[in-house]
């Protein structure tokens, strides 16, 4: 295995697009992907024809309500004929998509990349049941884990092992609310 380049080429975010974070019964998933993509491209001053790499960050298929949603939504964004890759890392899919785009650009696989993501978890019939299928099938599935219980167990472990306190978690929440309050499209816009 080769070592990473100690001085990789610089990569910059040159455009951003986002739709409001709320229930959108007035728009299809394709509409949301198209709107955010067009806004990001316009903000960057580039066209989809300038894009070499498309990174699709989508939730597990069970939450999207269909198999391989990226294959259906990317054409609506004008991404036909572009090299694409799907990324899914649970609650960190957005940053994982951006990071994947950065690494591919630094690796010389293209000059312009776009990370596109969409979440419509309301389309799943039973969100906890879907999440329960992503845990270890032998040891964890019968426990009935959810994202909340999984995070609570991890937080408890961090408190026992490294001395985190409830105040630390409150600081994280307060910081996140403060950041969200600066984004008028966020789900929670007040600190």
Describe the residue ranges of each PLM region.
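Condensing-enzyme catalytic core mediating Claisen C-C bond formation in acyl metabolism
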Residues: 1-30, 34, 39, 133, ...
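Acyl-thioester C-C bond-transforming condensing/cleaving domain
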Residues: 2-4, 46-48, 64, 75, ...
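N-terminal glycine-rich anion-binding loops that anchor highly charged ligand groups
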Residues: 7-15, 41-52, 61-75
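Structural motif
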Residues: 13, 55, 114-116
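Glycine-/proline-rich flexible loop or hinge segments
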Residues: 18-20, 51-59, 80-87
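Glycine-/small-residue-rich active-site loops that bind phosphorylated ligands and cofactors
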Residues: 21, 61, 93
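Metallocofactor- and cofactor-centric catalytic cores in central/energy metabolism, strongly enriched
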Residues: 24-34, 50-56, 61-62, 67-68, ...
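Short, well-ordered amphipathic alpha-helical segments that serve as non-catalytic structural scaffolds
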Residues: 30-45, 69, 97, 152-155
């Amino acid at each position: 295995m080769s070592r990473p380049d100690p001085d990789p080429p610089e990569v910059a975010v040159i455009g951003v697009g986002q739709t409001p974070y709320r229930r959108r019964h007035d728009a299809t998933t394709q509409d949301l992907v198209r709107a955010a993509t067009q806004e990001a491209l316009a903000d960057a001053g580039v066209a989809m024809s300038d894009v070499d790499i498309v990174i699709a960050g989508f939730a597990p298929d069970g939450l999207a309500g269909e198999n391989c949603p990226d294959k259906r939504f990317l054409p609506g964004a004008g991404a036909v004929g572009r090299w694409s890759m799907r990324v899914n890392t649970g609650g960190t899919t957005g940053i994982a998509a951006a990071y994947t785009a950065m690494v591919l650009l630094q690796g010389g696989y293209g000059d312009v990349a776009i990370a596109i993501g969409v979440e419509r978890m309301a389309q799943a019939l039973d969100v906890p049941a879907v999440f329960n299928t992503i845990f270890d099938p032998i040891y964890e599935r019968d426990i009935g884990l959810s994202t909340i219980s999984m995070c609570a167990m991890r937080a408890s472990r961090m408190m026992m092992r490294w001395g985190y306190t409830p105040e630390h978690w409150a600081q994280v929440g307060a910081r996140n609310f403060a950041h969200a309050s600066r984004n008028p499209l966020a789900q929670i816009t007040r600190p």
